[in-house]
Amino acid sequence: MRTVRRRELLGAAGAALALAAGTRARRAFGAEPVDLALVLAADVSRSINDDEFQLQRNGYAAAITSAAVLNAIGQGERRAIALCYNEWAGEGEEKVLLDWAVLRDKDSAQAFADKLLAQPRAYLGRTAIGSAIEFSMNLLAESGFDAPRHVIDVSGDGTSNQGDEVTATRDAAVAAGTTINGLAIFNKRAAALGGYLAAHTNPPGGIAKYYQTNVIGGPGAFVEQIDDFNSFGEAMIRKLVSEIACAEPAGDGAKAG
């Protein structure tokens, strides 16, 4: 992983300032009001095989359309959230699969999920978490919604091994008032292969600890951990409900330390 230079840090800081300024401007000029602007940033790096990827993708779709998530949206003051979905892998491998959409009911959630399931996998590369965060920050800056809360929801199964320094981009996002939460997946299959993959997917203290220390941050930030991709959908439901309601995670969640 390369070191972030001063120019890059200034770029991240500039994105943070633009995000904060853009939020104020949208509120001033009557942009569409929502309770939350949420970016789902999904790891599709090569440590995730095709079967695991499909479980992850299906889990996102199931969570978005779940009764629990729809109920959480309906309980908000504005009864709507803005949602954007991107997939990422190595540096420069970030792609918006579904641009911003407002979810306020079953039909809008189902339409989003159906479009998501129809998209092919974006990448199969390395793991650049910092670059994914910066990419997601830019999406928030350009979102065009009046949202009192901005959240980046990062899912992944390994440590960052390429691209921007994770903590630097995390700190820039937090400085802009953005919360970054994590869904850390312990990929037992990849870890059992040994060598680099074992170290990548099971770092000292575990992948959830890595996310807690390096990735998440901001008001109410937390990381949820799962031990296989089969439980991805259930974990994402818990995570989305907590993010939408701005509440404590109900499952195996750990706060930013």
Task: Please tell me what each predicted stretch does.
Residues A41-D51, L116-R126, G156-S160, A198, ...:
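Second-shell loop/turn segments in exported
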Residues R126-A176, V241, G257:
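Exposed acidic/Ser/Thr-rich ligand/metal-binding surfaces
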Residues V223-G257:
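C-terminal "exit" segments of structured domains
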Residues T159-Y210:
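VWA/integrin I-like adhesion module and closely mimicked acidic/polar interface patches used
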Residues G76-K115, G195-P204, A208, Q212:
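Short beta-strand-loop
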Residues E32-L97, D107-S155, A184-F186, A190-G195, ...:
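Von Willebrand factor
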Residues R2-T3, E8-R27:
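N-terminal export signals
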